[in-house]
């Protein structure tokens, strides 16, 4: 039985979204059980034989500064959910709450894996191959060293191997051009480290990739700093929404275009489904001594259910053990521990 702790109070909508999503998830996964963390008065109406309520009296808001979330709200639903993972009561935690707070609390309670300096958020962006490109970091670290980018590549490779079933996923380094001579000093050095790791058989380095390659599916994994990754994520979601809106606008211009819309409905429906970012919700916080997944704060029921499913798949397929094994084997490439740079603030996802 896979047990997931759910921060039911987090996000823009709280229990109005998380509870229905939890019910849908349980209906589809007979070997899963949920620990619903939150204020009892907000969760009291929910009843399921494979769900248990865990009381938490406080809520971390989307605007709470780190000091408040980490030091003052010690009985927040977010913190209590992560505590379940630390205590072994759950194999993974899921929250749609404040990203910076989630990362800080997760690092404080779970600690980072040996050989990892900074956890990273790994998310998915749909591509032209009908799959998804895994991008990391997506907002945890706005400044990264070359060693950090190598660590991200190692962790991302383990993630895609486990969740996508690819034995040797390709890794691309996001750059302003494909040539090795392009990019700043951090990117150039990261390229050297990734090529060395690839020659040693520790990962499958494709080479430098550009922004459009994310959507082409040129590489299974794209590594970058959290600032760039977060911008790419939000840009892709905005583009998908704009395309759908444009189609609606054009097909509603006249009686003739409305008839055309009826004829084209199956194609439009399939396109909309492939571009639906809700199906790719759920970013993994990689590099921790426990599994934590971040849902979009604005997630609806379907999106939050997908985040729960990704956490379930990760726990069922022993993602944490796979990441630990890969890092332990490859850590000598960056001297056992990546060299640190001044810590960057998290970018809310």
From Swiss-Prot:
NCBIfam families: plsX. This is Phosphate acyltransferase. InterPro entries: FA_synthesis, Phospholipid_synth_PlsX-like. One of its GO terms (cellular component) is cytoplasm. Its EC number is 2.3.1.274. It catalyses: a fatty acyl-[ACP] + phosphate = an acyl phosphate + holo-[ACP]. The lineage of its organism: Bacteria, Pseudomonadati, Pseudomonadota, Betaproteobacteria, Burkholderiales. Homodimer. Probably interacts with PlsY. Keywords: Cytoplasm, Lipid biosynthesis, Lipid metabolism, Phospholipid biosynthesis, Phospholipid metabolism, Transferase.
